[in-house]
């Protein structure tokens, strides 16, 4: 119980060197390239899920937006597998680091905005000034719309960080309370343990939902700019 509550969010090191790069690369092992003519059940399920997600997410895009399919599918698989691996005991979740999430959100957001200004310049500039705006409100609305545009990647990264971090902290607190109550009140400890099991199941769902939400918002930003 004396362990620092945020110790599990510290970047792990080996021989004094951070190994976060190895941790980030680890999810790629979960999706191996098939080397046989007939896929096994696991690979077939993975391919079916990827195809289903890509159809739902990319249905709203035109031909220019469709070129982002591979990137968006890689993004949702990476975030989802990273979140799920972070639920394992004594593991590290890179998506609890705001710096990493910003590193994903800013380039993707910047790419969508760049495409908008390149292919739909007039429409992209029109977003800064809604139609029918009174003349005396034009300067204020331009500033507000500019701020709302630049805050999109920050909100994207903070949303993912906050949801994953909150779940891990809650599991840590309930797990610590369960251990402390085992010697004091076993019946109460059993109740908290059941709550912990239910929360863990919920966190598995949250891990996948947050990966989908992050990728879906990037997809919507792309749709607005293509």
Swiss-Prot record:
Protein name: ATP synthase F(0) complex subunit a
Disulfide linkage: none
Organism of this sequence: Equus caballus (Horse)
Main location: mitochondrion
Record-linked PROSITE patterns: ATPASE_A
Transmembrane region(s): 12-32, 68-88, 97-117, 135-155, 164-184, 189-209
NCBIfam families cross-referenced by the UniProt entry: ATP_synt_6_or_A
Encoding gene, per UniProt annotation: MT-ATP6
Family: Belongs to the ATPase A chain family.
Entry annotated with the keyword Membrane: yes
Assigned GO CC terms: mitochondrial inner membrane; proton-transporting ATP synthase complex
A single GO molecular function term of this UniProt record: proton-transporting ATP synthase activity, rotational mechanism
Oligomer and partners: Component of the ATP synthase complex composed at least of ATP5F1A/subunit alpha, ATP5F1B/subunit beta, ATP5MC1/subunit c (homooctomer), MT-ATP6/subunit a, MT-ATP8/subunit 8, ATP5ME/subunit e, ATP5MF/subunit f, ATP5MG/subunit g, ATP5MK/subunit k, ATP5MJ/subunit j, ATP5F1C/subunit gamma, ATP5F1D/subunit delta, ATP5F1E/subunit epsilon, ATP5PF/subunit F6, ATP5PB/subunit b, ATP5PD/subunit d, ATP5PO/subunit OSCP.
Keywords in alphabetical order: ATP synthesis, CF(0), Hydrogen ion transport, Ion transport, Membrane, Mitochondrion, Mitochondrion inner membrane, Transmembrane, Transmembrane helix, Transport
Job of this protein: Subunit a, of the mitochondrial membrane ATP synthase complex (F(1)F(0) ATP synthase or Complex V) that produces ATP from ADP in the presence of a proton gradient across the membrane which is generated by electron transport complexes of the respiratory chain. ATP synthase complex consist of a soluble F(1) head domain - the catalytic core - and a membrane F(1) domain - the membrane proton channel. These two domains are linked by a central stalk rotating inside the F(1) region and a stationary peripheral stalk.
One record GO biological process: proton transmembrane transport
Pfam families hit by this protein: ATP-synt_A
Recorded topology in the membrane: Multi-pass membrane protein
Catalytic reaction equation(s): H(+)(in) = H(+)(out)
Keyword Mitochondrion belongs to the record: yes
Localization per record: Mitochondrion inner membrane
